[in-house]
Amino acid sequence: EDTLTARDLLSVSIISADTHALIKSFFEAYSCISNNIYVHEGVGDINVKTIRAMVEAFAKKHQKTPVVIIDYIQILAPYQSKTVTDKQNMDKSVLELKRLARDLNAVIIGVSSLNRMSYNDAITMSAFKESGAIEYSADVLIGLQLAGVGGDKFNVEQAKQENPRKIEVKVLKNRNGPVLPSYLMYYYPADNLFVDVLEKPNALPLAQLFDPLQQQELPF
């Protein structure tokens, strides 16, 4: 499919008619869903209290609870006094997000960074940075890692130079269901695009990973 990267747009002094038409088609496609997307830039001291106030105001106004995506949780402002440690603040923030999800029956997706010691090893639940509360509080934990990481011949720099990169999706925790097999995807960095790769015999389409209607068809 035709794609344009941010670099493409910034490096073109005069946009051709074909490129202009392509950009227009992108905006038209986005306009179909844009009314359902609200973006709050992380400018200023946004913490879990701020997020809770936003979600409660939205739910009251629209009579429905939004899906909340936090990118990413390690840069949230401290929940409590700055005299406590980063880990204590992060644990408190994660626990309050869990409470928000429970109180409003909301879906909250939090993006997390990993500790640097995990870059060359297979991802585990302990890899999530600065917080054991992530491991214990989350209903579902999904990790992304370069395929082959942790192997004797794995070279992280070489793997990052590949285009596309092979990315393995690992379900580390699924509180209310089975932990499914790893899933392989291609990642195109220039386009920030993930593409399904059905190379493994037991791989599932990503949309089926947590579809309860597909549970009886899982390959185990």
Segments and roles (model prediction):
Residues 2-10, 14-17, 24-32, 49-68, ...:
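C-terminal regions of RecA-like/P-loop NTPase motor modules
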Residues 35-37, 106:
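Short, conserved active-site loop motifs that form the nucleotide-linked donor/cofactor pocket
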Residues 38-39, 141:
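Conserved beta-strand scaffold positions in the cores of enzyme catalytic domains, especially
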Residues 41-50:
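Functional beta-strand-loop-alpha-helix junction segments that form "active/interaction loops"
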Residues 51, 89-96:
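Hydrophobic alpha-helical membrane-association signature
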Residues 72:
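Walker B catalytic acidic pair
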Residues 76-77, 144:
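Catalytic P-loop NTPase motifs of RecA-like helicase/translocase cores
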Residues 110-113:
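Conserved H-loop
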